[in-house]
């Protein structure tokens, strides 16, 4: 997934300041003392499960396709990690929750209040992250099942599956 996302970054460019901030957040996740499975669960459920629908609603064809591919894997990861963390009696510390909030706010920083399209409203996505963190579900994402997937004509022929 990292490689596919990096191709998208390479094609669209990256903001140098945002990259520096992202690396600081990455390091904070790595250094955080909570159990690694718990950190993975929080990142997947309350960050990735927010960003992937965001990418499917607001991304270009490449980003929508990659987000759909990643979503399938993340569903399995979250299910497994939820069970393991429950069996081990692990729960997120307040400092891990603060790190989650800092991370999702960093990613959604360019968004603001949007009164005509909820999928461009920062609060919509932040609220979903909170609900996923505390309740494990985000009913406001029921529409994401209908998010538009790229059609064959939106990709170069070289990027289409070959069956022969």
Residue ranges and their predicted role:
Residues 1-164:
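Non-heme di-metal
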């Amino acid at each position: 997934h990292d490689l596919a996302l990096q191709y998208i970054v390479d094609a669209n460019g990256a903001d140098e300041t945002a990259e520096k901030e992202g690396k600081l957040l990455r390091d904070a996740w790595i250094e955080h003392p909570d159990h690694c499975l718990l950190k993975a669960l929080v990142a997947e459920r309350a960050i990735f499960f927010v960003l992937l629908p965001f990418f499917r609603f607001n991304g270009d064809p490449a980003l929508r396709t990659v987000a759909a591919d990643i979503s399938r894997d993340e569903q399995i990861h979250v299910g497994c990690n939820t069970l393991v963390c429950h069996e081990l009696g692990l729960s997120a510390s307040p400092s891990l929750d603060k790190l989650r909030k800092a991370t999702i706010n960093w990613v959604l920083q360019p968004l603001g209040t949007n009164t005509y399209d909820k999928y461009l409203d920062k609060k919509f996505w932040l609220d979903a992250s909170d609900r996923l963190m505390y309740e494990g579900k985000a009913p406001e994402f029921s529409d994401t099942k209908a998010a538009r997937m790229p059609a064959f004509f939106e990709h170069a022929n070289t990027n289409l599956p070959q069956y022969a």
